[in-house]
Amino acid sequence: MARASCAWHSLWLLQWTPLFLGPSAVPPVWALNLDSEKFSVYAGPNGSHFGFSVDFHKDKHGSVSIVVGAPRALNASQEETGAVFLCPWKANGGKCNPLLFDLRDETRNLGFQIFQTFKTGQGLGASVVSWNDVIVACAPWQHWNVLEKRDEAEKTPVGGCFLAQLQSGGRAEYSPCRANTMSSVYAESFRGDKRYCEAGFSLAVTQAGELVLGAPGGYFFLGLLARVPIENIISSYRPGTLLWHVSNQRFTYDNSNPVFFDGYRGYSVAVGEFDGDPSTTEYVSGAPTWSWTLGAVEILDSYYQPLHRLHGEQMASYFGHSVAVTDVNGDGRHDLLVGAPLYMESRADRKLAEVGRVYLFLQPKGPQALSTPTLLLTGTQLYGRFGSAIAPLGDLNRDGYNDIAVAAPYGGPSGQGQVLIFLGQSEGLSPRPSQVLDSPFPTGSGFGFSLRGAVDIDDNGYPDLIVGAYGASKVAVYRAQPVVMATVQLMVQDSLNPTLKNCVLDQTKTPVSCFNIQMCVGATGHNIPQKLHLKAELQLDLQKPRQGRRVLLLASQQASLTLSLDLGGRDKPICHTTGAFLRDEADFRDKLSPIVLSLNVSLPPEETGGAPAVVLHGETHVQEQTRIILDCGEDDLCVPQLRLTATAGDSPLLIGADNVLELKIEAANDGEGAYEAELAVHLPPGAHYMRALSNIEGFERLVCTQKKENESRVALCELGNPMKKDTRIGITMLVSVENLEEAGESVSFQLQVRSKNSQNPNSKVVMLPVAIQAEATVELRGNSFPASLVVAAEEGDREQEDLDRWVSRLEHTYELHNIGPGTVNGLRLLIHIPGQSQPSDLLYILDVQPQGGLLCSTQPSPKVDWKLSTPSPSSIRPVHHQRERRQAFLQGPKPGQQDPVLVSCDGSASCTVVECELREMVRGQRAMVTVQVMLGLSSLRQRPQEQFVLQSHAWFNVSSLPYSVPVVSLPSGQARVQTQLLRALEERAIPVWWVLVGVLGGLLLLTLLVLAMWKAGFFKRNRPPLEEDEEEE
């Protein structure tokens, strides 16, 4: 029993469990003639799974209704028994009425046995089918049990079907798997066990009225088919009896072959003609778990002998979940379609994606077996369950080939579901959908879980489609619109002669080369309106941008024309002629490519603003082309002979520098005209085009652009349109090149002269290598602060206040500057300072202060704790620290005096060596070392009359440059810094007579100035007149 329970639950889950999925991609498609805007919607009770199964029903008066199954609907006692609804068709939907059946559990006694039926949870409406006046609705999970004393058959889902005769109101039931065999009979063997049939899980009916039921749980889940004429079911039915005999019912046989175990034969069923005998019917059965879940589809004859057995290609893909039979290629033979909604394909990331697949098997001529699928339709949406349902549609667009609908009930932009329409054709089916219907219901509706087509519900001559969405408990009816088959012709002359100016523009009176364009449009179709309004749009030189069109209409000087055409469905085509002209050759570049003219025909929207009532199909778009006649000889074919030479000079490119490279190029054409000729210079990484000049008068500055081609930059310069025969152009192109650190020892420029000619369009490619080198210039400068120092000997006794009062400090500074362009590694700087900080030395090293990353060491190290002796009253002190009165100092040696003494390390004097290192110095970087020294008092006292020049000396070198290219030279250099030590003269008293002469001279000058002013009347003053004086006057 555990095995039976597990298998039964797997059947239930695959049919009923919805998946909630994320967005998925749908390939772009064009719409055909199912009206996706004006569809009818029928709704059932919430949660009833209304739409789980659907079918059309046409009564004897020709009225069409829709039969809808709702397997989870509640009965009047609020028990979940399921229900079947009949919905009269209306354009705007309408109310659905339930068909009444006896849905009560029943118990009957027959001798020592008690028969029981259990209809709660039976799933009435899981499958429905209509034939003539009869509607068959099945409940595959209806349970049955037989009790006999202490034994029982066990309560199991045998399944059952209900039949409703609409005209007479009669009812009948059919449950082919009911039996009164006790479970003890099956204790040793399950052979022949029909207790788990789930009869009616799938359902089909032949044109003759033979009912075919699939029972995937029959024979202990091998599955079986049961078929019987509907008339026999009705005639054999005995109300009030739970177990009765139905004549002429036939079952498939049990099988002990392990490949059939748990195969679920009868999971899907269909009928068709596959043996070449139209008088017989063959039965198609899907077994999706046959041969350990590989799946199979069988085509059985009337004796249930297998004619064909088709195997799945992938384990657990559920090959055979759905089957459909129709003639898609118009050869008069039925073809087979099989769905495998769990098929997984391997994607680019090597992961498996569950997308679903549909297999098309075209029936060959003669007795050949169906084996290899003719076409594979694979879903594109992850977990969309493409192929869950397949429905023949009939000839949807009236082109002579039957079409099909394939459902992906959990596909679509948000997992709401989709139905894809595939058109039949002579080769089978179109590989891409002609129309995609997106679910109008919320996510999880299962839109497309059930499909039914091939019936004209609105009597317009085109078959319509029912789509069930059980998750939303709704059904949508899509009606097919009439299809207008268009025929379009466009005629234009083969070539245009630009030199033949046979027309004049009205506005500018400019002569132009003109030509005529003729357009013809026709339309035919089944049941189309007598008067048809079409819109025709003509586009000139469509492949060019709107502002670059080479031909325009004469009347409007525009590149497009829209016409309104009125024609009947059976009238002859309507033709219209218009004039156009070729623009002047100076207004465009392209003279070689064809001029493409396009004519597109479409249906304008209705005056109410809605979609048209018909659909336009067929030849709605046509293109023709013409060309411009060229001056290229009798064959009108120009064959250029393009040449190119180039040089780049001898100077290499330097890493780190702002290089400007001058390319000398000569382009020549020794053949016929080269149209749209251009110089193409492929620039290496780091190179940028600046400008290009030519040696042609009036053509000095070339028109060039920089573009990207194949991830590299290329400079394109126009050379003429056309570049005529025997043309020679000298070109100088300037290119900036930088960022060469990773370029290697050279960069290459690829040059070529190209044209748009069809024959021999380009010159040979010239590769121009340019060497790369590394170079750096490092500058060393020195400075002394102060540049000179004046000292003088003082008379009298002074007490020493501090070291700075009596001792002068000096600084020798050396600065390194990398001017570039490259970076240097391993820079080493040596500085020699005279003296080793001994008491007898003239200079005493105080400190070494490096900056800019330098690391320095001193040998010997400065003795910062060395004690100086106290200077005597006759010692000297720097005059720049304190000055009481003006002093004279010695600028240089006077006659009889000695030259200044040079104190440096060039001789045998003892010196201090400062050694500094810098690992890396980039372009523009600076580094500095400051050496602080002070003068030694004892040395100056010993040599009071001497002047000195204090000199330090520095050298530097570089070990390498961090590049794998040749180095021009390694930087090195030296510098010296000098400080002059000057002696001041002794102070002298000013003579008294100098003072007396100065005072007397000043008094004399003042007296003379006063006398001159008196003579000039400066001291005479006049009083201003009073008012009385003015009155007297």
Curated annotation (Swiss-Prot):
* Subcellular localization, as worded in the UniProt entry: Membrane
Residues binding Ca(2+) 4, per UniProt: D456, D458, N460, Y462, D464
| Any GO CC annotation of this UniProt entry | cell surface
Q: What highest taxon heads this organism's lineage?
A: Eukaryota
Q: List the disulfide bonds.
A: C87-C96, C138-C161, C177-C197, C503-C514, C520-C575, C632-C638, C704-C717, C856-C916, C905-C911
Carbohydrate-modified residues are N46, N75, N600, N710, N957
Look up the signal peptide feature and give its range. Answer: 1-31
In alphabetical order, the GO MF annotations are: extracellular matrix binding; fibrinogen binding; identical protein binding; metal ion binding
Q: Where is this motif: GFFKR motif?
A: 1017-1021
Q: Which GO terms describe its biological process?
A: cell-matrix adhesion; integrin-mediated signaling pathway; positive regulation of leukocyte migration
Keywords tagged on the record = Calcium, Cell adhesion, Disulfide bond, Glycoprotein, Integrin, Membrane, Metal-binding, Receptor, Repeat, Signal, Transmembrane, Transmembrane helix
Q: Which residues lie on this side of the membrane: Extracellular?
A: 32-988
Query: Pfam families this protein is in?
Result: FG-GAP (PF01839), Integrin_A_Ig_1 (PF08441), Integrin_A_Ig_2 (PF20805), Integrin_A_Ig_3 (PF20806), Integrin_alpha (PF00357)
InterPro entries reported for this sequence: FG-GAP, Int_alpha_beta-p, Integrin_alpha, Integrin_alpha_C_CS, Integrin_alpha_Ig-like_1, Integrin_alpha_Ig-like_2, Integrin_alpha_Ig-like_3, Integrin_alpha_N
Positions binding Ca(2+) 3 in this chain are: D395, D399, Y401, D403
Q: Where do the TM regions start and end?
A: 989-1014
Could you tell me which residues the FG-GAP repeats occupy?
35-96, 109-173, 184-237, 252-304, 305-370, 372-431, 434-495
The UniProt entry, under SMART domains, shows: Int_alpha
Q: What is its main location?
A: membrane
Q: Does the keyword DNA repair apply?
A: no
Question: Which segments sit on the Cytoplasmic face?
Answer: 1015-1033
**In which residues is Ca(2+) 2 bound?**
D327, N329, D331, R333, D335
Q: What does this protein do?
A: Integrin alpha-IIb/beta-3 is a receptor for fibronectin, fibrinogen, plasminogen, prothrombin, thrombospondin and vitronectin. It recognizes the sequence R-G-D in a wide array of ligands. It recognizes the sequence H-H-L-G-G-G-A-K-Q-A-G-D-V in fibrinogen gamma chain. Following activation integrin alpha-IIb/beta-3 brings about platelet/platelet interaction through binding of soluble fibrinogen. This step leads to rapid platelet aggregation which physically plugs ruptured endothelial cell surface.
Q: Which family does it belong to?
A: Belongs to the integrin alpha chain family.
Describe the subunit structure: Heterodimer of an alpha and a beta subunit. The alpha subunit is composed of a heavy and a light chain linked by a disulfide bond. Alpha-IIb associates with beta-3. Directly interacts with RNF181. Interacts (via C-terminus cytoplasmic tail region) with CIB1; the interaction is direct and calcium-dependent. Interacts (via C-terminus cytoplasmic tail region) with CIB2, CIB3 and CIB4; the interactions are stabilized/increased in a calcium and magnesium-dependent manner.
Query: What name does UniProt use for this protein?
Result: Integrin alpha-IIb
State the organism of origin: Mus musculus (Mouse)
